[in-house]
Amino acid sequence: MLQSSNHHYLRPDYMTAAAAPTAQLDNKSSPLALLAQTCSAIGADTTNPKLLAANIEKSTKQLQHHPKGSSGSGGSGSFGLSQQASMDGSARDKSSPVSSHSSSVSTGSVEQQQLPPAHGSSSSSKPTPTTFKPYEPNNNISNITTAADCGATNLSSNNTSAQQRVKTPKSMTNGGGQRCDSNQSASSQHRESPTAAGSLRRTPTSGLAGGVMQHNGSPGLPPTASTTPGRSNSKESAAMHSPSAAAAAAAAAAQIASSNRLQEAALAAAKEANYVKALHAASQQGSASAAAAAASYYPPGYGSPYSMDLMTASSLMSPHHAMFKASAMNPYLNYARMKGLTEQSMMAATPNVCRDPYCTGCPASPHYINKAAGQPCPAGCPQCEGGGGGGGGSSKSSGSQGGSGGSSSAAAAAAAAAASSYHAQLAALAAASQMPYVCSWIGSDAAYCGKRFGTSDDLFQHLRTHTASVPDAVLSAAAAGGIPPNHPLFQRTYPTPPLSPLSAARYHPYGKPSMLPPSLAPPGMPGLPPHPALAQYFAPYSLYGPRMGSSHP
């Protein structure tokens, strides 16, 4: 298609050597050749040995023409290190060209932040060209400038001196200024031993700043490079002159903190040991020794403690120890405040105290322990109602007031009540483990019984005392299986608290009716008028049994 020489299109081979003598130009210095070299260096073309050889030759020529000495001890050390690093860089160029290119790219990016005339007029014999060559692998003057910039960026005088870079092997390779690596940060320099750091910090600040100015050779240096070493050196000199004082202060503070922690731990351990000793003594000895052991644990201002002869070993109390700690003082006072009780009513145990034997913090709960120890029962006790409960309550209140040391302050009374309730909780748990049989007898004219027994025979004998007061008509109807479903026997007139274990026996709409046998649950009579003394809680399964049929399991 391009056979005719008169064609208006150009021939594709017009740049041949014979046709175009302009191709004999210097390919190395032409802008197009420089652009081609730059583009090939971006891609890290490792298959181009001519480009790598040209870069190595250029770097070695710059090393030979650069002067060997300069004024200033810090400056000569920095220059010698950068020269050695550049030699290492040129040696690395032969082995790994990719790393040399990547390091040269980072060098160029840092070099862009410098002023072009800043490349040392005082420290170099020949003027450095101001042309920006970003992909030059080893430029000594730019390396020194980059090293100074690294020190200024890290805001520490340690990083601008070459002697401290020798201490760290990693910053030896990076000391040529190829990259502002994180290994040259002030934190990595401070990881050395204190003696070595103190000896290295003795370099004067003026010498360091002078060395930096000699290498840079320009007044356009950022002010942080000359002012920051002075600031940091003043701090370091203060730390250097008094390392023993700082270490002694830190050691004293640590010792004080550790001693405080040890004292707190010792106090807690002693209290726990006394608590466990009291429990063991109570479980192994009689009532007198148990009372003495409990008195050794409780201060005398807490009043006379309850007898702990019913306590078991510490294995019984260990699962509930956290609960005891949590409900020691304030929860009981909050509970009494919620119930509307005052300190006087708490100490006198007025009848408005809740009578749940599982109540967490009820003064009337350990009535069985009071009777076992020969102490009078508090007023409001369901067993003592109608049997001299008033006199017992007055004697109990007077005894508790006398046991508190005659103190009339409300704080002492509240502390005594809280201590007694805490002890009552321990006794209730121990009694629950030793006497599992509870009488849950409730009558329309009687309160909740709540007595505990160790065997089922004792409970059965106690139930006979309740049934003796029931009318004969009711007993005969019960024997015939015709007890009316709205009888108080099938009702819960006592509202137990939600946290009580007794609440598990209350009616639940999705529970199984295991409380009554089928013969005692006849069809209900909705038209039957309720008894005047009937409570507000009905037995729902006996009322709605015929409607459920076989739908309920």
Curated annotation (Swiss-Prot):
Function of the molecule: May negatively regulate Notch-induced cell proliferation in the eye-head primordium. May act in leg and wing primordia to negatively regulate body-wall specifying genes and thereby promote appendage formation. Required for tracheal development.
Region feature Self-association, mapped onto this chain: 287-480
The residue ranges flagged as biased composition, category Polar residues, are 137-146, 153-173, 224-236
Similarity section:
Belongs to the Elbow/Noc family.
Provide this UniProt record's keywords sorted from A to Z.
Developmental protein, Metal-binding, Notch signaling pathway, Zinc, Zinc-finger
State the residue spans of region: Interaction with noc.
287-553
This protein is called what? Zinc finger protein Elbow
Q: What ranges of residues constitute the C2H2-type zinc fingers? A: 437-466
**Cellular component per GO, a single term:** nucleus
Q: Where is the composition biased (Gly residues)?
A: 388-406
User: Could you confirm whether the keyword Nuclease appears in this record?
Assistant: no
Provide the GO biological process annotations: compound eye photoreceptor fate commitment; eye-antennal disc development; imaginal disc-derived appendage development; negative regulation of DNA-templated transcription; negative regulation of gene expression; Notch signaling pathway; open tracheal system development; wing disc development
Extract the ranges annotated as region (Disordered).
Answer: 59-243, 388-407
Compositionally biased intervals (Low complexity) = 96-110, 121-134
| Coiled-coil stretches noted in the UniProt entry, renumbered to this chain | none
Q: Keyword Iron-sulfur on this protein?
A: no
* GO molecular function per UniProt: zinc ion binding
Q: How does it assemble?
A: Self-associates. Interacts with gro and noc.
* UniProt organism field: Drosophila melanogaster
